[in-house]
């Protein structure tokens, strides 16, 4: 009986100690986080290049398309320069043809190719797939983008870039006609419009993550339309 009383007393003291350590001396003043929250993952359909490769094994070559900005190239320096030059603090520069003439003439020689794009394009070319680039950019008076992309990604059978911006189109999303015209099976892009254009065309859209320091803000919601999202695709 005495032993039982001793054990009960010890248990009470231990519980009291745990309670003391667990209690907050003062309420938090900021939202903060904890180790458990930091490791939580959203229920997103993540996919890897290796998984895609295995999935496509044994299948006939297909046509695939890529958006350019924040998908295959980190081109924010060009857009930052354009905004500072043509409309500081505003996005009016995106409607200025002089900006598009300048950026498309050769600014992308200073853009950084994303490693995820290198990996994807290498995988698709090894399969014999055709690669197309479909961008929301407005065409300039000179296309300096196509040769930059061909060199950066070692494209064997290069097709001219499709500039869809500023065109009157019969679809809701401006990349949809290009996707349909080239009989694309998979379209890769970072923006909501990329995923929605793929849906409009009735094909598979796969999201690439946008770099956190991109000038293209706000950031889109990954998996917001139920699309697959490539892991480690922000660089």
Swiss-Prot record:
GO terms for cellular component: outer membrane-bounded periplasmic space. Mg(2+) binds at residues 67, 69, 190. Homotetramer. Gene3D superfamilies: HAD superfamily/HAD-like. Dephosphorylates several organic phosphate monoesters. Also has a phosphotransferase activity catalyzing the transfer of low-energy phosphate groups from organic phosphate monoesters to free hydroxyl groups of various organic compounds. Substrate binds at residues 135-136, 175. Binds 1 Mg(2+) ion per subunit. Coiled coil: none annotated. The keyword Metal-binding applies. Residues 1-22 form the signal peptide. The active site is at residues 67, 69. Keywords: Hydrolase, Magnesium, Metal-binding, Periplasm, Signal. GO terms for molecular function: acid phosphatase activity; metal ion binding. Belongs to the class B bacterial acid phosphatase family. It is found in: Periplasm. This is Class B acid phosphatase. InterPro entries: Acid_phosphat_B-like, HAD-like_sf, HAD-SF_ppase_IIIB_AphA, HAD_sf. The keyword Hydrolase applies. Its EC number is 3.1.3.2. It is an enzyme of class 3 (hydrolase). It catalyses: a phosphate monoester + H2O = an alcohol + phosphate. It comes from Haemophilus parainfluenzae (strain T3T1). It comes from the Bacteria. Its cofactor is Mg(2+). SUPFAM superfamilies: HAD-like.
């Amino acid at each position: 009986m005495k032993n039982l009383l001793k054990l009960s007393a010890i248990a009470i003291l231990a519980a009291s100690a745990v309670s003391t350590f667990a209690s907050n001396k003062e309420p938090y003043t900021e939202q903060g986080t904890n180790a458990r929250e930091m490791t939580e993952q959203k229920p997103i359909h993540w996919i890897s290049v290796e998984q895609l490769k295995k999935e496509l094994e044994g299948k006939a070559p297909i046509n695939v398309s890529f958006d350019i900005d924040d998908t295959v190239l980190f081109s924010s320096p060009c857009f930052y320069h354009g905004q500072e030059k043509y409309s500081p603090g505003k996005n009016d520069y995106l409607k200025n043809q002089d900006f598009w003439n300048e950026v498309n003439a050769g600014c992308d020689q200073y853009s950084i190719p994303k490693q995820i794009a290198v990996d994807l394009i290498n995988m698709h070319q090894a399969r014999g797939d055709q690669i197309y680039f479909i961008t929301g950019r407005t065409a300039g008076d000179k296309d300096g983008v196509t040769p930059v992309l061909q060199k950066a990604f070692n494209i064997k059978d290069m097709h001219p870039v499709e500039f869809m911006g500023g065109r009157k189109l019969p679809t809701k999303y401006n990349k949809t006609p290009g996707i349909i015209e080239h009989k694309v099976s998979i379209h890769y892009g970072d923006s909501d419009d990329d995923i929605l254009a793929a849906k409009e065309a009735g094909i598979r859209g796969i999201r690439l993550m946008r770099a956190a320091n991109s000038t293209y803000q706000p950031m889109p919601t990954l998996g917001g339309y139920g699309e697959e999202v490539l892991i480690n695709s922000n660089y």
